[in-house]
C-alpha cells in the first residue's frame, strides 16, 4: 500500500487540475475582498422587437448565401422542395394557411386560451377582443385599436362611442382619420403573413392607377365634424384622397387651404405632385402645374425631400416625346442635388423610364447610373425603390443587349442587403427571366450554363419563353450534351405540355445526331418519354371532355426517327402502327426521313411485312420518294412473290427496276 501511495505522488498532475487549483486558491484569496465590496448590480437590457425571421436572418448571415440550397421556408427534402413556380406558391401559402388556421382556432375558442404562462405576457398569444353593437367601450379601446391597426374594429368602436355620447378628443379623431385615410377604410394584412405579401404584392399593384377612394365614408365625416380644422386635418385627408386617386376632391381641398392660408407639410405637397398627370391633360400644363406646386412650397417655407424629387420625376414619366422629358428630368435632378438630396433607387427607376423608352432612341444612361451607385448599400425610401432592379435588367436585355452591364446590376443586387429591394415574387421572377435571357443570347453556352446551374431551380424556375431561348442556343451551338439535363428540368417545371418546346427539342435531336452511343440511348429515352407523356395528357383531356389538338404527324415522325436511330425496333414499330392506324386523328404527315429510317431499320431487322406496310403508307399519302423507297426494299431484302406484288401494286414497276445510277455503274 505504501508503494502505491508513493507511485501516485510521483505522477505529474494533468494541466486541467493545475488550472483548477490556481482558480480555487485565487477565489479563496479574493473572497475576503469581494465580501467587503458592494454587490454588482445586474441590469436587464430592454426588450428588442424582432420579426419572426430575424434570428434566421442572423444565422444565415454567418454562412452566406447558398444558391444551391432551397429557401429555408421549404422542407429540406428532395420530395418536399418545390420544383415549379406553382408549387413554390402553393407550398408557401399552405404554410401560411396553417398560421391563419391557428389564429382562427385561437380566436373562435378564446375561452380555452386564457392561461398566461409567459412573463411578461406575449400579446400575440392572447385572443383579441371581439366587439359588436352591444359592447361597452371606452376611449382607451379606440386608442388600442388604432395603435394595433385594426381598421374595422376601430370604425365600430368609434361609432359606438359616438352613439353612447362619449366624447372623443380632437387628437384621437386626428389619429382615427389618419388610419382611415392610409388604409382607405379597409383591413390591412397582418405583418406576420410574410408569404402572402410576397406573392400578393405584384398582383395588387396592377390595378392601382384608378380611383379606389371610398367617398362619403367615416374619414370625410370626421373631417367635417371637426370645427376648428388644423393643417394636419387637411394634410391627412388630402394625402388619403391623392393616394387612392380621388384627385378632384384632393385638389379642391388644396385650393381651400390656399384660400384660407393654411400651411401644409412636405408630404402633402408630394402627394399632390404625384397626381399632377391626372389633373392636367397636356404635357405642358402638367409641367406648369408641377412648377406651381413647387413654388407654393417655397413660399410656405418648406424644404423638399426625396419624396418631392420622386414625385416630380414620376410626373415627368407621363410626358410624351423624347427631348422635353429628358431636359426636365436632368434639370430636376441637378436642382435637387444642389439642395443636398441624393436620389434613391426610385429616382433612378424614373430616370430609366424617361430615357429608355420602348420606341425611343437608345440611351446609355444606365452606365452612368451604375457608375454612381455601384458598391453602395440601399435602404427602402420609396415604394418604387423595388422597381429599379427589374427595370434595369429589362434595359440590359431589351434596350442595350449588354451582358456586362447586366452582371454589374446583378452584383449590385447581391451587395450586402440590397436583395431586400427586389420587391416581390413577381418582380423577382421577371428579373431573373431578363437576366438569363440576356446571358443566353450573348455569352458562350458553357459560361451561361454555369450561371444556369447556379440559379435553377432553387432561386429561379425558368418560364417556357426562357426555356425556348436556351433550346435555341443549344441548337445554334450543337451542344446536344445538355439536352438530357434540360429535358429533366422541363419535366420538373411542368413544361412537357408545351408543344412549341417539344417540337424544338425534337428538331434539335433529329438535326444533330450524336456520335456517342450513350447519348443516342438517352435521346431515345427522351423521345419515348415525351410520347408517353403526351399520350397521357391527351387521354386526360378526352376524359374531361376538353378539346385537344392531339398528336401531329411531324412530332410523331421525329420521335420515330430518334427511336430508329437508337435501334429500338419495338418502340419504332408501336409508333409506326400509331401513325398508320390513327391517320384521321393525326394532324399532318410525318417527314419522309422518318419513313425512310423505319424502312431501313425494318430491313436491318429483316421485317419485310412492316417495311412494305410503311411503303403503302407513303404511297397512299403521296410521298414523291415512294418509288425510291420501294426500290430500296426490293434491292435490300429477299422478298417472296406476295411482297413483290404489293410493291408493284403500291408504287408501280419502276420500283422493281434498277435506278439509272445503278445501270450506269453496271455498265
What residue spans do the PLM features occupy?
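A basic, Ser/Thr-enriched alpha-helical scaffold prevalent
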Residues: 2-667
